[in-house]
């Protein structure tokens, strides 16, 4: 399940992020990659332990956990502290095909998560750079994603994916992972579809409609059945 989430951050906040990030020191992105990923990764990152990365990351997590579409699709249990990367044409930056590590640990907080879902939050407008598409492969083929600044995409961490070479400008983004309360991807997808159907019925029939109430009960009971907390 691939879900695009518009306007996670407003344009004004994206501009503030970019101003702070443009003034920061960046490091080789391979410092946070696993052995296989490091062989195909060419980009820059904000130092993950820097005050700036941690501060901006907390703001992203706060925005996402208040976003109903994100909560519905992810059913998040733990969110890894967001990281920040930059792909510049001047550096020939790209990230070859790879799959994310199954478990991520943060040595500052001691947090360890199973990576169920990956998130990319775009911080550069599509017309600021050429190339840099996020290409995600699943059973239905390849999907190219290049969203407006402030928008995010959520996709299974089990997916093979890549970032195509940037040939003009710079692609700036935040990326991170989360552990869902619902481990099984198919169950999580059904929960998301059910929630969307319930919200559509609420709009049409009202929250007090007996069938809407019944379906809402089924939704919560399915989460109760599947959730790991």
UniProtKB/Swiss-Prot annotation:
Residues 78-180 form the Fe2OG dioxygenase domain. Its cofactor is Fe(2+); L-ascorbate. The keyword Phosphoprotein does not apply. GO terms for molecular function: 2-oxoglutarate-dependent dioxygenase activity; iron ion binding; L-ascorbic acid binding. The keyword Transport does not apply. PROSITE patterns: FE2OG_OXY. Binds 1 Fe(2+) ion per subunit. Its EC number is 1.14.11.-. It is an enzyme of class 1 (oxidoreductase). Keywords: Dioxygenase, Iron, Metal-binding, Oxidoreductase, Vitamin C. Gene3D superfamilies: q2cbj1_9rhob like domain, Rabenosyn, Rab binding domain. Pfam families: 2OG-FeII_Oxy_3 (PF13640), PKHD_C (PF18331). SUPFAM superfamilies: Clavaminate synthase-like. This is PKHD-type hydroxylase Rpal_3968. It comes from Rhodopseudomonas palustris (strain TIE-1).
């Amino acid at each position: 399940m691939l879900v695009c989430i518009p306007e996670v951050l407003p344009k004004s906040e994206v501009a503030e992020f970019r101003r702070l990030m443009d003034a920061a020191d960046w490091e080789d992105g391979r410092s946070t990659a696993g052995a296989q990923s490091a062989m195909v990764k060419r980009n820059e990152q904000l130092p993950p332990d820097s005050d700036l990365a941690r501060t901006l990351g907390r703001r992203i997590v706060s925005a996402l956990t208040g976003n109903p579409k994100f909560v519905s699709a992810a059913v998040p249990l733990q969110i890894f502290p967001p990281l920040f990367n930059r792909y510049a044409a001047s550096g020939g930056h790209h990230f070859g095909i790879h799959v994310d590590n199954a478990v991520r640990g943060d040595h500052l907080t001691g947090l360890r998560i199973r990576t169920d879902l990956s998130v990319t939050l775009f911080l550069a407008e599509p017309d600021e750079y050429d190339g840099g598409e996020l290409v995600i492969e699943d059973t239905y083929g390849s999907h190219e994603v290049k969203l407006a600044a402030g928008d995010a995409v959520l996709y299974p961490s089990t997916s093979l994916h890549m970032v195509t070479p940037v040939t003009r400008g710079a692609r700036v983004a935040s990326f991170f992972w989360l552990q869902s309360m619902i481990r099984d991807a198919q169950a999580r997808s059904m929960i998301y579809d059910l929630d969307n159907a319930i919200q559509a019925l609420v709009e049409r029939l009202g929250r007090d409609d007996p069938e809407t109430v019944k379906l809402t009960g089924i939704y919560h009971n399915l989460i109760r059945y599947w959730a790991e907390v």
